A protein has these predicted regions:
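N-terminal helix-turn-helix
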Residues: 1-67, 101
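Short helix-loop hinge/linker segments at domain boundaries
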Residues: 46-48, 52-56, 63-64, 74-96, ...
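Short amphipathic alpha-helical coupling segments at ligand-binding clamshell hinges
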Residues: 61, 65-67, 105, 202-203, ...
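Central regulatory/effector-binding core of bacterial HTH transcription factors
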Residues: 90-153
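Hydrophobic hinge/microswitch elements
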Residues: 128-132, 137-140, 147, 201-256, ...
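Flexible hinge/capping segments at coil-to-helix
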Residues: 152-195
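Beta-alpha-beta core module
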Residues: 153-159, 163, 225-274, 282
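Secondary-structure junction motif
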Residues: 189-210, 277-284, 293-302
C-alpha cells in the first residue's frame, strides 16, 4: 500500500531537485528520504526518478505521479484548513526576516505562533532583503518578511505594513530646534542600512546632488549598531523611527524635522506557491494582524501625535 509520507517525500525531491533538499524541507535525514523513495518505487513497480545527474529529475512515470502527488498534498492542506485542529499543525517552518521586523513585531509573532500552533517550530534567519529574496527563490527558506513585494515567477505576496523613514540624531548634536536642509545634514556622517539594500540606495541618491560635497555614509548590517552609533552622537541615523521608540521616549534620540522626502519602507510576506502552503498561510495571517497594529512615526511633527495604524 502506497504510504502518504512517501508521496510527500517524492513531491519534495522533485520540487527541490535533490534528496538533501527534501530532507531539509521535511526535517529528516537523506538516507530516510532515499528509503522512502525506494519503497515507493517498489510499490509502484516503476522507476520514478532519474538519479544520473547532479539534479534529480522525474522519469515519465514520475511526471505522471507528480500530478497526483500535488493534488493529494493540496487536498490534505484543504482538509486540515477546513476540519483540522489548529494546534495539531506540526513541523518546521523556515522563516527569513529583515532586521526592521526583528526590532518591531517579530517577538509578538513568535508568541502568537507558539500559542496558536504549539507543535509548529520556527527556524528564523535574519538577513537583508536581497539575500532573503535569493534564498526564498532557491527554496532555502519557506517564508520571508522583507522589503517588497517580491516580483518573481511563482511567488505570492501579502503586504504587511509601511514604516516611514526617520532622520534621527542625539540631542548632543543640537539639531532639534529647526527644519534642516540637506546641506545641514550633509555636514554630519550619515548612518543607515547596509549596501545592496533599498534604503541605502535611496539615502545615497538623496545626498548625491550637484553642489553638495560627498557625504560620509556609514552602512551597517546591524540596526543595533546603527542605533548605538546615533545615540553616541557619531552621526545622523536614517532608519524607521518605529524601531527606536524607547530611545525617542527617554530622550537619547530625537526625530529631526527636514525637507527631505523619503518614501516609506513597505514590508511584505513573500512565499513560493506550493501544494502544501497551509502552515505558511497561517503564519502570514498572524503576521498581518500583528503588523497592522504597528505604530508608525513619519517625522518630528508626529512625535506627540496619537499612534497611527497601518492599513492595507
Amino acid at each position: 500500500m502506497v504510504d502518504f509520507k512517501s508521496i510527500e517525500t517524492f513531491l519534495w525531491v522533485v520540487t527541490l531537485g535533490s534528496f538533501r533538499g527534501a530532507g531539509q524541507r521535511l526535517n529528516t535525514t537523506q538516507p530516510a528520504i532515499s528509503q522512502r523513495i525506494a519503497q515507493l518505487e517498489r510499490e509502484m513497480g516503476v522507476k520514478l526518478l532519474n538519479r544520473d545527474h547532479r539534479v534529480v529529475s522525474p522519469t515519465p512515470s514520475g511526471r505522471q505521479l507528480m500530478l497526483y502527488a500535488e493534488k493529494l498534498i493540496s487536498l490534505r492542506a484543504e482538509m486540515m484548513a477546513e476540519i483540522g485542529d489548529r494546534s495539531a499543525m506540526r513541523g518546521v517552518l523556515r522563516l527569513g526576516v529583515a532586521e526592521t521586523i526583528v526590532h518591531t513585531w517579530l517577538p509578538q509573532l513568535i508568541k502568537s505562533v507558539n500559542t496558536a500552533h504549539p507543535n509548529l517550530s520556527l527556524e528564523i534567519e535574519v538577513d537583508i532583503t536581497p539575500d532573503l529574496s535569493t534564498r526564498l527563490l532557491a527554496q532555502e527558506i519557506d517564508l520571508a518578511f522583507l522589503v517588497g513585494p517580491l516580483s518573481a515567477s511563482g511567488v505570492r505576496n501579502r503586504v504587511l505594513c509601511d514604516y516611514p523613514i526617520g532622520i534621527l540624531a542625539s540631542p548632543s548634536l543640537g539639531l532639534g530646534n529647526r527644519t534642516l536642509k540637506v546641506q545641514d545634514l550633509a555636514k554630519f556622517p550619515i548612518i543607515t542600512f547596509p549596501r545592496r539594500s533599498q534604503p541605502y540606495e535611496i539615502v545615497r541618491s538623496l545626498f548625491n546632488r550637484p553642489g553638495l560635497s560627498p557625504i560620509r555614509l556609514h552602512a551597517s548590517a546591524s540596526l543595533a549598531t546603527v542605533i548605538h552609533m546615533a545615540v553616541e552622537g557619531l552621526g545622523i541615523a536614517v532608519i524607521p523611527a518605529s524601531i527606536v521608540e524607547n530611545e525617542l521616549a527617554d530622550g537619547r534620540l530625537q526625530l529631526l524635522s527636514t525637507d527631505l522626502k523619503i518614501p516609506p519602507l513597505t514590508f511584505s510576506a513573500s512565499w513560493l506557491e506550493s501544494p502544501d502552503m497551509l502552515a505558511v498561510e497561517r503564519v502570514v495571517d498572524l503576521a498581518a494582524k500583528i503588523a497592522q497594529g504597528s505604530a508608525v512615526i513619519a517625522d518630528a511633527s508626529d512625535v506627540d501625535a496619537p499612534r497611527s495604524v497601518v492599513q492595507f
